[in-house]
Amino acid sequence: MKQILDFIPLIIFFALYKMYDIYTATGALIVATAVQLILTYVLYKKVEKMQLITFIMVTVFGGMTIFLHDDNFIKWKVTIVYAVFAAGLIIAQILGRPIIKGMLGKEVTLPDNKWNKINYAWILFFTACSIANLYVAFEMPLDVWVNFKVFGLLGLTFIYTLLTGMYVYKHMPKEKKEEQE
């Protein structure tokens, strides 16, 4: 259910972009992200930091897009969000508190060196997505960027999450694997 909530603003953004324009879609994205945040809190009594960061970025850059009537701001939002996620993972790694381990470490037991590899892999992933978005956003037509944002980045994230899950499963202690099966 929580994952479905995460995709609703993106679906609304895409649909309204196709029906109207980037400005209508951006306004709807701001509203849908706010509603998503409220629903997440009501249903789960907790909001993840990533959701809060995304909401703030959507509101700031989406607001600038609408107010200044310049779609470059919403394009920058995607790049900056991915860069902030990568920077957060880097800082946490330097401080010796890998975020991925904090998110999954209660359910999954892995050696620290495996958690570090996963953390570094996600740093690379978020950095690559940030750079890829820069290229597509500013070198391709708006339609291509919207499709890339909705389907390309979403698809890449889904695949990367699956690959991470496979890596985790491969390195889980044998008794934990048996419990999961």
Curated annotation (Swiss-Prot):
Protein's cellular compartments: Cell inner membrane
Record-linked Pfam families: IspA
Keywords, sorted A to Z: Cell inner membrane, Cell membrane, Membrane, Transmembrane, Transmembrane helix
GO cellular component, one term: plasma membrane
Domain of life per record: Bacteria
Transmembrane parts of this sequence: 22-42, 50-70, 80-100, 118-138, 148-168
Region forming the signal peptide: none
UniProt topology in membrane: Multi-pass membrane protein
The family this protein is said to belong to: Belongs to the YciB family.
Record function comment: Plays a role in cell envelope biogenesis, maintenance of cell envelope integrity and membrane homeostasis.
Protein name per its UniProtKB record: Inner membrane-spanning protein YciB
